[in-house]
């Protein structure tokens, strides 16, 4: 029994290691990319949230029940989702099959199927730890985009009276506002949201207005150059055609960037190969453990570590407060006079904090 407990403790301890280069980031330096793993951890009772494959299977099931897909097509898509590796292509073909032959985004039965699968999701939140961790980072300036169709994060945030807002790429004004950091609680759904019949798209051709808009593309790609993207619960995001079109294709010197991806380490050989491959994209792959059960706790602990970082503004406020009841001008002069001493004290404090992390 003791041996089992020690092994478990070692495993848990190993899953709690953090890269110093990541936990010393200010929250406002981060852009969180949320994938299906987050939804799966939050609402484990909904199979459609567990993976892309499960989501597509649930949509096919809904299409069959709603009788919006020919039985022969239902059988063919079930075969594809079982055998095909590129699930994004399967999902794209499924959308096309339930959309007008003209290629227009609406009207489409695909959205009805998504509503069948995802409606009333808020009632199924069972483990909000990951959502709370993400909100804590958003409170401190982190940005969020997602490849998910669901709005679990927004629903959870509204419960806490946060002014959450969902947006997709079809609203240029809001996208620019979000990308420039003026929408603190905005969540960009790059595939659209299940509640929006026009916004659900998997093919970059559906976003021609965006990808051909120089202003929008420059602002979005500038995020990839200047922010540290933190991929949370993402599996195939870098193979996602829309993500590639928005962030990867036109951003040079990706190896000079510093992004992070949290992954499950099921197989060591695969993990270390994936780690080496992702460095070419400027992405550091980090394992949260060898079991998905470690994921929520790892994200919570990681967010806690990052939120400990004091922003430069906070330091200035704290230093001014220490001066007691002096007037504001006197306080400023005092800070300037003792700037070197204050800086030294802060450096020593930072050193102490770093040693304890």
Swiss-Prot record:
<comment type="similarity">
    <text>Belongs to the FAM118 family.</text>
</comment>
<feature type="modified residue" description="Phosphoserine">
    <location>
        <position position="311"/>
    </location>
</feature>
<keyword id="KW-0597">Phosphoprotein</keyword>
<feature type="transmembrane region" description="Helical">
    <location>
        <begin position="30"/>
        <end position="50"/>
    </location>
</feature>
<keyword id="KW-0812">Transmembrane</keyword>
<keyword id="KW-0472">Membrane</keyword>
<dbReference type="GO" id="GO:0042802">
    <property type="term" value="F:identical protein binding"/>
</dbReference>
<dbReference type="InterPro" id="IPR038916">
    <property type="entry name" value="FAM118"/>
</dbReference>
<keyword id="KW-1133">Transmembrane helix</keyword>
<keyword id="KW-0007">Acetylation</keyword>
<feature type="modified residue" description="N-acetylmethionine">
    <location>
        <position position="1"/>
    </location>
</feature>
<dbReference type="Pfam" id="PF13289">
    <property type="entry name" value="SIR2_2"/>
</dbReference>
<dbReference type="GO" id="GO:0016020">
    <property type="term" value="C:membrane"/>
</dbReference>
<protein>
    <recommendedName>
        <fullName>Protein FAM118A</fullName>
    </recommendedName>
</protein>
């Amino acid at each position: 029994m003791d041996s089992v407990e020690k092994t478990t403790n070692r495993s848990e301890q190993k899953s709690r290691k953090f890269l110093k280069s990541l936990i010393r980031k200010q929250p406002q330096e981060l852009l969180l990319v949320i994938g299906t793993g987050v939804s799966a951890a939050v609402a484990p009772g909904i199979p459609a949230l567990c993976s892309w494959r499960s989501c597509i299977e649930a949509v096919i099931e809904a299409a069959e029940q709603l009788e919006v897909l020919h039985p022969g097509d239902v059988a063919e898509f079930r075969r594809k989702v079982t055998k095909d590796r590129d699930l994004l292509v399967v999902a794209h073909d499924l959308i096309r099959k339930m959309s007008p032959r003209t290629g227009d985004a609406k009207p489409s039965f695909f959205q009805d199927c998504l509503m069948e699968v995802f409606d009333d999701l808020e009632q199924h939140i069972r483990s909000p730890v990951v959502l709370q961790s993400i909100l804590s980072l958003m409170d401190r300036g982190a940005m969020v985009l997602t490849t998910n169709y669901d709005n679990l994060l927004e629903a959870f945030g509204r419960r806490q009276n946060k002014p959450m807002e969902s947006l997709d790429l079809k609203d240029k004004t809001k996208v620019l506002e979000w990308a420039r950091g003026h929408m603190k609680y905005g969540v960009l759904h790059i595939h659209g949201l299940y509640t929006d019949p026009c916004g659900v798209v998997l093919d970059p051709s559906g976003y021609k207005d965006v990808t051909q808009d120089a202003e929008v593309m420059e602002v979005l790609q500038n995020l990839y150059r200047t922010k540290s993207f933190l991929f949370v619960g993402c599996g195939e995001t870098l193979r996602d055609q829309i993500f590639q079109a928005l962030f990867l294709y036109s951003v040079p010197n990706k190896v000079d960037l510093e992004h992070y991806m949290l992954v499950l380490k099921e197989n060591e050989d695969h993990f270390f190969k994936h780690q080496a491959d992702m460095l070419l994209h400027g992405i550091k792959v980090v394992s949260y453990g060898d079991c998905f059960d470690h994921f929520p706790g790892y994200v919570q602990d990681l967010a806690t570590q990052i939120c400990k970082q004091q922003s430069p503004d906070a330091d200035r406020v704290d230093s001014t407060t220490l001066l007691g009841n002096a007037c504001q001008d006197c306080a400023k002069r005092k800070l300037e006079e003792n700037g070197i001493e204050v800086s030294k004290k802060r450096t020593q404090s930072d050193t102490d904090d770093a040693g304890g992390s």
